[in-house]
A protein has these predicted regions:
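Interfacial helix-loop-helix junctions of multi-pass membrane proteins
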Residues: 125-126, 161-189
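Membrane-interface loops
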Residues: 23-38, 66-150, 192, 196-208
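Alpha-helical transmembrane segments of integral membrane proteins
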Residues: 4-12, 74-82, 151-155, 175, ...
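Long, highly hydrophobic alpha-helical transmembrane signal-anchor segments
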Residues: 51-71
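Hydrophobic, membrane-inserted alpha-helices
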Residues: 57-61, 132-140, 157-164
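N-terminal transmembrane-helix/juxtamembrane module of multi-pass inner/ER membrane proteins
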Residues: 1-58, 103-104, 109-112, 207-208
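Alpha-helical transmembrane segments of multipass membrane proteins
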Residues: 12-20, 58, 83-91, 162, ...
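Membrane-embedded alpha-helical segments of multi-pass membrane proteins
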Residues: 14, 53-57, 132-133, 178, ...
Length: 208
């Protein structure tokens, strides 16, 4: 069971990376999403630390959810897949980017430079997949039946910090965060519908 669960997560991660970075090869006429309000949001390079929490969070959190409530995991998985597909569709239809600031010298500044460099071309801004997935984690943490209260508190807190850090690291603009809200809501509705339809088949495959 555990091996199949890890396999599902590995396939999802590969699917996400392939679509996320692959779609950048086809983007033309990039639109600037930066607005005057974004200049009022401070740049804190040290917040790259909570920003990077996203990567282990999306790897470990689903496994915790599955052990607690398989249905919540199934609806989480379906929603996540839809978020990825819809996000990439948005990136292809309306490519977005903006000019990032020059990080200062020092440890956190150098760390920030690595993140900027890892973003490839600095595209795929709106809607923020970082934020929409965090909204999904927050929602799942609240509704997951039987989840330990401390796990709820920790995961929601980390997810909120990640969303805020997308702004203070200048990886995203306010528009990116706001457009992630309707993306999440639509994906969530469709994800629940798919989970209701394929939950039994999914459990049979996993072997729960």
């Amino acid at each position: 069971m555990f091996k199949k669960l890890v396999l599902v997560q590995a396939i999802l991660l590969f699917f996400q990376i392939l679509l996320y970075f692959g779609c950048e090869l086809f983007q033309r006429r990039i639109h600037d999403v930066k607005r005057p309000v974004d200049a009022k949001i401070p740049f804190f390079p040290w917040t790259v630390l909570p920003y990077c929490f996203w990567f282990p969070l999306i790897a470990v959190y689903p496994l915790v959810v599955f052990q607690t409530d398989p249905y919540s995991y199934c609806s989480y998985l379906m929603t996540m897949v839809i978020e990825i597909v819809f996000s990439v569709a948005c990136y292809l239809i309306y490519p977005t980017s903006f000019q990032r600031p020059v990080p200062p010298d020092g440890f956190w500044g150098d760390f920030m430079k690595l993140i900027y460099h890892g973003s490839y071309r600095g595209l795929n801004c709106a809607p923020s997949l970082h934020c929409s997935s965090c909204f999904l984690i927050i929602c799942t943490s609240f509704i997951c039946v039987g989840m330990n209260p401390w796990i709820r508190i920790v995961t929601v807190s980390i997810a909120v910090m990640i969303v805020l850090s997308t702004l203070t690291t200048k990886q995203h603009t306010l528009i990116d965060v706001l457009t992630a809200v309707p993306l999440f809501l639509i994906s969530r509705i469709l994800g629940i519908m798919l989970a209701d339809q394929y939950y039994v088949q999914f459990l049979t495959f996993i072997g729960k």
